[in-house]
Amino acid sequence: MYGNVGLATARGSGTNGYVTRNTAHLRIREGPPGGQPYGSGYDALLESVSKPPIHRAPDQGILEHERKRRVEVKVMELRDELEEKGMEEDDIEEECSKLRQKLTAQPEQLGGRGLDTHSLAAAKEIEMSRLQRALGVSVNHEEGRAFKRETEEEKAARLAKREERERERIEAAITRERENEKRKQEWEEKERLRRREEYKRRRRD
């Protein structure tokens, strides 16, 4: 008990006996930490959460360093093995040099893959690239585009493009119909002339 507030004893109360402030009545803070509210309320909140996730590209320098480190680990393992067999230092250096050149030219023989964040990011990047090609996803595809709220300008531009495509389709159909009609008339004219010539030839005979 403190200041005549609280329990005389904590026994049987299921609490520690200390007085704590009730925060149930406090208003939930809006916006990010710091008390700054979102720009225009709910719309700005939706805009912020609808942005596509940011994928950090792996650092090629770190990946190269990790590859070289793994090569040297293999070389040191070979060196220890040859030293235990009692080989000459020159022969050991030659074998280590051959193995180093082989692993540098064919890094896939290192086996396994790194467990650091950059190695995992590189493997994930390759996996996503394969999946993208398999599903036929465009390179310019924007993640989260389906959940992005369309502005009035974007909607007007989209409708204008749709009307333009529809107009071009109708014009192309009319042009094809006119060409077909023209070819039909030309064929009928040729057929009429052919029949006339044939009729004249029969009259002469």
Swiss-Prot record:
Keyword Kinase applies: no
Keywords: Coiled coil, Cytoplasm, mRNA processing, mRNA splicing, Nucleus, Spliceosome
Compartments reported by the entry: Cytoplasm; Nucleus
Entry's Gene Ontology cellular component terms: cytoplasm; spliceosomal complex
Keyword Cytoplasm: yes
PANTHER family linked to this entry: SERINE/ARGININE REPETITIVE MATRIX 2, SERINE_ARGININE REPETITIVE MATRIX 2
Family: Belongs to the CWC21 family.
Self-association state and partner proteins as the record states: Associates with the NTC complex (or PRP19-associated complex). The NTC complex associates with the spliceosome after the release of the U1 and U4 snRNAs and forms the CWC spliceosome subcomplex reminiscent of a late-stage spliceosome.
Official protein name in the record: Pre-mRNA-splicing factor CWC21
Gene name linked to the record: CWC21
